Regions:
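Surface-exposed, beta-sheet-biased, low-hydrophobicity segments with strongly acidic/polar composition
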Residues: 17-187
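Positively charged n-region of N-terminal signal peptides that target proteins for export
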Residues: 1-4
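C-terminal motif of bacterial Sec signal peptides marking the signal peptidase cleavage site
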Residues: 12-16
Length: 187
């Protein structure tokens, strides 16, 4: 009985610290500049999706392992599409932020758009979370990864390098962490 009480107290202490599984951040948050091409009206060989976990663009005709894709609708609006919009399951989410890119320090836990297109413009700031991933140190508990992106340019023309969005994206690939600042996250 004494050991049970000690175990309960230890678990409570770990949970009170804000990281219930005691996972340590190991990977520095990284910012990359990315170009995606519209799902429609561009060669199929160009990447239209982005995987947060891989920190890489994805050719959507080769794989569905991406967290969001880019397209341009018939009205000429630039769209970011979470997986639910593409009937791939509601596994990732996006939300527009009113804060400047550099001011966002931590990802919110709610109010993500899971199943409809997000209209973006030049300078839009978006917060995203990924499909759930099981990390080695998480004891089998799946976690999403978080990211923030800042739209740099959108080209809606049909020129050879058009129908494209360019953005900078900062990704946090640490299980259980939502920190969106450069370096190893603390929260």
């Amino acid at each position: 009985m004494r050991y049970f009480i000690l175990l309960v107290l230890a678990c409570g202490g770990v949970a009170a610290c804000g990281n219930p599984l005691g996972l340590h951040a190991y990977s520095p948050n990284q910012t990359d500049t990315v170009s995606l091409y519209a799902l429609s009206g561009t060669p199929i060989s160009l990447p239209s999706g982005f995987s947060i976990a891989a920190r890489h663009t994805v050719r959507t005709e080769l794989a569905s392992a991406f967290d969001f894709a880019f397209d341009i609708d018939t009205a000429g609006r630039a769209l970011l599409l979470p997986t639910g919009t593409l009937k791939l399951g509601k596994h990732s989410g996006l939300q527009i932020s009113a804060q400047p890119f550099d001011s966002i320090k931590i990802a919110p836990t709610s109010n993500y758009n899971l199943d409809s297109a997000l209209v973006v413009n030049d300078s839009s700031v978006v917060i995203a979370y990924s499909n759930l991933s099981v990390c080695g140190a998480s004891l089998g508990v799946p976690y999403p990864y978080y990211a923030k992106l800042h739209v740099l340019t959108i080209d809606t023309t049909s020129t050879p390098n058009g129908r494209r969005i360019d953005f900078e994206i900062l990704t946090d690939l640490n299980c259980g962490y939502r920190g969106l600042e450069p370096g190893v996250p603390r929260r």
